[in-house]
Amino acid sequence: SEMKEIYLDRTEKNNSKWLELITDALKTSKRFEIHCWNEETDWIEFALKYGTLKESTWRYGKVIEGDVTPEFVTMILEMPKPTDIEIYNKMTPFFNIFLDDIKFQSCHYGTEIYIEDEMV
């Protein structure tokens, strides 16, 4: 199926548009995957409270997977917008968040979103 692409750039003052999109996707999602760079140790540790390490061929990072639980949803939706926005205007501290494999993809800290067309 087709993927719809949405880009959130520097003009976004907050992450409300990102939150709106992921809130919708979380309602029907069963599983999540979070990708963090190896040096993002705090976020890896944090994500591991909600899932487990997945075997991955990505040498430069870690992949955490788990069930979309009410606790996970709350964590994602209540996470404040990051303030380290020099490189990316980050919407989330997590590099990638995938829901139900690739049905919903929040990439590059939420600056690029891909949504399966049925969901739009």
Give short role names for the model-derived ranges.
Residues 1-120:
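Structured alpha/beta or helical-core interaction and ligand-binding surfaces enriched in interleaved
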